[in-house]
């Protein structure tokens, strides 16, 4: 019998608002993204659980770091959405401090999945996330989300431009993704599961 993919085993574990409250370290992959970029929808698609991550019509609603257990040794981590203008400055500052410290100091973090809206990639805050994470030397996989809203020529152009702009970052990879059409879901899942269990990684098709 084929083992159930690791991502499909996800279930809620805990939420934390302070760095000191983080659970004991395990191998983990963090999902980050600008508010309303489609992060929660991406998590729900990749785990095949429609309501695992909270989706809201009000960007910036998720203010906690949410941990989802995959196995006894691994977590999927949903980081607070960032960059929504209506969030009070003091709340925004708290989020930014928590995010930067988590990304830079969480030793068990295997990699970061950074979700960007394919129509507006590499915003200043997206770049800030990359800068915070760069000193760790750990991999970043960018999902250019909502790709279904672009024409085929726009998809190709956007992917090429983002790859060119990040060409000097050896630890960064990029792909197109759509939670609605499921474009790129298998590619992303293979990448993430490879980070969590390299010895058990399934080779990407083709």
Curated annotation (Swiss-Prot):
Signal peptide start-end: none
Cellular component aspect of the GO annotation: cytosol
Keywords: Cell cycle, Cell division, GTP-binding, Magnesium, Metal-binding, Nucleotide-binding, Septation
EngB-type G domain sequence ranges: 25-198
Coiled-coil ranges (or none): none
Cofactor(s) listed: Mg(2+)
Gene3D superfamilies cross-referenced by the UniProt entry: P-loop containing nucleotide triphosphate hydrolases (3.40.50.300)
Pfam families the record matches: MMR_HSR1
Cross-referenced PROSITE patterns: G_ENGB
Binding site for Mg(2+): 40, 62
GO biological process: division septum assembly
UniProt GO molecular function: GTP binding; metal ion binding
NCBIfam families to which the protein is assigned, alphabetical: GTPase_YsxC (TIGR03598)
Function description: Necessary for normal cell division and for the maintenance of normal septation.
Family to which this protein belongs: Belongs to the TRAFAC class TrmE-Era-EngA-EngB-Septin-like GTPase superfamily. EngB GTPase family.
Protein name: Probable GTP-binding protein EngB
């Amino acid at each position: 019998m084929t083992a159930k993919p690791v991502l499909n085993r996800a279930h809620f574990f805990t939420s934390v608002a302070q760095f000191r409250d983080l659970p004991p370290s395990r191998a983990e992959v963090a999902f980050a993204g600008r508010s309303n970029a489609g992060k929660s929808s991406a998590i729900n698609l990749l785990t095949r659980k429609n309501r695992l991550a909270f989706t809201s019509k009000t960007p910036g609603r998720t203010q906690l770091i949410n941990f989802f257990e995959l196995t006894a040794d691994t977590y999927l981590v949903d980081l607070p959405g960032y960059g929504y203008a209506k969030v009070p400055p003091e709340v925004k500052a708290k989020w930014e401090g928590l995010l930067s410290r988590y990304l830079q100091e969480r030793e068990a973090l295997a990699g970061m999945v950074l979700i960007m809206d394919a129509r507006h990639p590499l915003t200043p805050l997206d770049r800030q996330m990359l800068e915070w994470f760069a000193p760790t030397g750990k991999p970043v996989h960018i999902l250019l989300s909502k790709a279904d809203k672009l024409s085929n020529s726009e998809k190709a152009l956007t992917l090429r431009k983002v790859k060119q702009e990040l060409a000097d970052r050896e630890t960064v990879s990029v792909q197109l993704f759509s939670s609605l059409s499921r474009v790129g879901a298998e590619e992303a899942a293979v990448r993430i599961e490879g980070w969590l269990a390299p010895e058990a990684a399934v080779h990407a098709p083709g």
